[in-house]
Amino acid sequence: MTPITKSFQYGQHTVTLETGVIARQATAAVMASMDDTSVLVSVVGKKDTKPGQDFFPLTVNYQERTYAAGKIPGGFFKREGRPSEYETLTSRLIDRPIRPLFPDGFMNEVQIIVTVVSANPEIPTDIISLIGTSAALAISGMPFNGPVGAARVGYTDGQYVLNTRTSELEISQLDLVVAGTKGAVLMVESEAEVLSEDVMLGAVMFGHEQMQTVVNAVTEFAAEVNTPKWDWVAEPANVTLKDKIKALAEAEMTEAYQISDKMARKDAIVALTDKTVAAIVEADAEQDAKEVSELLHELESDVVRSRILAGQPRIDGRDPAMIRALDVATGILPRTHGSALFTRGETQAIVAATLGTERDAQMIDGLNGKVDSRFMLHYNFPPYCVGETGFVGSPKRREIGHGRLAKRGIQAVMPSEKEFPYVVRVVSEITESNGSSSMASVCGTSLALMDAGVPIKASVAGIAMGLVKNDENFVVLSDILGDEDHLGDMDFKVAGTTEGITALQMDIKIEGITQEIMQVALKQAKEARLHILGVMDQAISGHRDEMSEFAPRIYTLKIDQDKIRDVIGKGGAMIRSITEASDTNIEIEDDGTIKIFATERAKADIAISKIEQVTADVEAGKTYEGKVTRIVDFGAFVEILPGKEGLVHISQIAHERVNKVADHLSEGQIINVKVMEIDRQNRVRLSIKELLEKPAAPAEGNE
C-alpha cells in the first residue's frame, strides 16, 4: 500500500493522518498526531458473521504506553498492567459516537485498538484518538456512516476556546468534548462550573461547527486512500413475518406496556414473547425462533414510541414532563460519616460519604505525572438491583463511567482544600434501577455530603431526559425509565444547581437532533432539576454544623521549620511514637504546619502536648521532670524533653558528698532537675541539689 499523509490546521494545533507505513496487516491503521501527541489506531473487522450472532460485537480499547511520555512504569513488574480509570473512560468516549454509525443488521466483529505512542502533557489524547479512529474507520471499507469529528471546548472570560490545552483547562469554566458527523451531534461529555443552559448549548454548537474541519479532512483522506467498500448488504426485512407477529401480538403488547410496575411488565412481555414464538414455530417448523424474538422486539419499540408520539400516557402513566415520586432520607447509616437514601420511582441509591486524611488521597500516576485526587466517587451496580443474578467482582466499564459522570456533576460545588482539608470518598450503591441511576447518584451524593458536614457550595441534582422522534414530530421525556432509554432516540443527562449546569452528558442514536430539540430538552431538564432540588432541600438544605462523632477532627498547630526534623525523629521514630501514644494521624507540611486527625479531643491534646514537648527549647533556670537514661561514673544523663538530654554531674546530685552515682540514682528513675547552664555547644548542665533544701548548719559548741 502506498503511504498517504494528510495534514491540516485545527485550531491552535496541526493534525496529521498517515497510513500505509505501520500495522499494514490490520484492516485499517492510522497514525494520528496532534502536534507531538501521537496515537496509533488499528481497526480489524471480520468479513464473516458468527452463526447465531444477534448483537454488534464492537470492542474499543484505548491504551497508554509510558514510553510515550519518556517514563518507566512503577511497580515490581515495570510494565503496563490493567487499564487505568482514564483509559477505560477514553475507551467509552471513543465507542459512544461511532457505535450508532454502523448500520442496523451489521453483526461482524470489529475491534479498535488505540495506542498512545507519543504524549505532550499539554495536549490531551482523547480528541486525537477520536479523530484517528474516525479516519481508520473511513478507510477500512467497512459499512460506516461517518466520518466523525471531535472537539474539546473550553469557556474562559466569556469566550469559547477550541481544543484547550491542559494548562488552559485549569482556568476554564468548562471542559466539554463533543463528537458528531457533518449533519448531527452524536455525543457530549462535559464538566462545568455552574454555567447557564444557553452557554452550554452554545458550546455544543460551537464545537460541532469547528469539527467540520476534521470531517472534511477525513473525507478527503479517505477519498485519497480509496479503499474498496465491503460487499455487505443488510438482509431484507421479513415483512410477511412482521405483519403476522403484529396481528398476533400488538394488542397484548400494548396492554403489557400499560403495566406500570417494571417487574410485572417484564413478566408479561416474556410470557407474550414465549406464547408468540411458540404459535409461529408450531405453524411453521422451519421458522427461526430467534428471528421471531427480534421482530417482537421491534414491535415492542413501535408500540412504545407510537403511544408517546400520539400524546398518550407514558409506560407508567406519566405525561412527558412529569417526574416520578421522590423519597429522600439522610443519616440512615449510623456509623458512617454521612449517608443518604435517594429514591425516584423504581430507581434507588444508598450513598455513603467518608472523610479521611491526606494519606487517604488517591495517587494517580498518569502520562502527565503523579497527582493526588482528594475527592473520589465510586458507583456500584450489583445484579440484584434489576432483579437478576450475575458475576460480582471488580467494577465494569459502565460502573466506572457512571461514577465519573456523577463526580463531574458534584466537582464544581466541592470546597477547596483550604476551606475543608479532608479527603472525601463517596460510594453510591444502586439498590434498585429503572432508569438514570447515575443521576440518582448525583442527588444522593449531594445529600450524603451535606449529612457529613462537607461545606458544598450548593445542592446538586441530576435528571435524565429522553427523546422519541419521527420525522418532524418529537417528544422530550423527563426522568426516563429504563425501557424509554432503551427504545428512545436520545439519552441526555443533566446535573446542576439552582443557578446552572455542572455536568452534561448526551448520547444520540439518530441524526437530525436540532438545536431546537436540545433547547427544549435543556429547558425541560432545568424544570425537573429545580423540582428535585426543592424536595431535597426539605430533607436537608445545607451542610450540618457538626460532623459525625466517628469522623476524624482536624487540629492544626504551627512549628518552626527547623523543628520538623525533631518531630519526625530518626527514621520516623518520634512521629510514630506520638501517633501510637495518642491514637491519631499526623501530617507535617513543609512550612511547619502540623495537622492532627483525631476522633476525640483528648487524643488530639495528647499529640499536641507531645509535639510541644519535642519542639520546646530548653530554658536555663527552668525546672523539668526528667527520666534518667544513663548512669556514668561522673554523673547521670537525664532526658528532660523528648530527644533532649542533659548531664547531672556527680557534684550536683546532693549537698553531701556522693561517692557513687548508683547509690542515689537508677536508670528509668523519674526526677526533678533544674537547668543550670546551656553552653555554646548546646550541652545542658543540670542539677538536682539546687532543688533540695540545704541541711541545717551544726550548732556552735556542739562536739
UniProtKB/Swiss-Prot annotation:
It catalyses: RNA(n+1) + phosphate = RNA(n) + a ribonucleoside 5'-diphosphate. It is found in: Cytoplasm. Residues 552-611 form the KH domain. Mg(2+) binds at D485, D491. InterPro entries: ExoRNase_PH_dom1, ExoRNase_PH_dom2, ExoRNase_PH_dom2_sf, KH_dom, KH_dom_type_1, KH_dom_type_1_sf, NA-bd_OB-fold, PNPase. One of its GO terms (cellular component) is cytosol. Its main location: cytoplasm. GO terms for biological process: mRNA catabolic process; RNA processing. Residues 621-689 form the S1 motif domain. One of its GO terms (molecular function) is polyribonucleotide nucleotidyltransferase activity. CDD domains: KH-I_PNPase, RNase_PH_PNPase_1, RNase_PH_PNPase_2, S1_PNPase. Component of the RNA degradosome, which is a multiprotein complex involved in RNA processing and mRNA degradation. HAMAP family: PNPase. Involved in mRNA degradation. Catalyzes the phosphorolysis of single-stranded polyribonucleotides processively in the 3'- to 5'-direction. This is Polyribonucleotide nucleotidyltransferase.
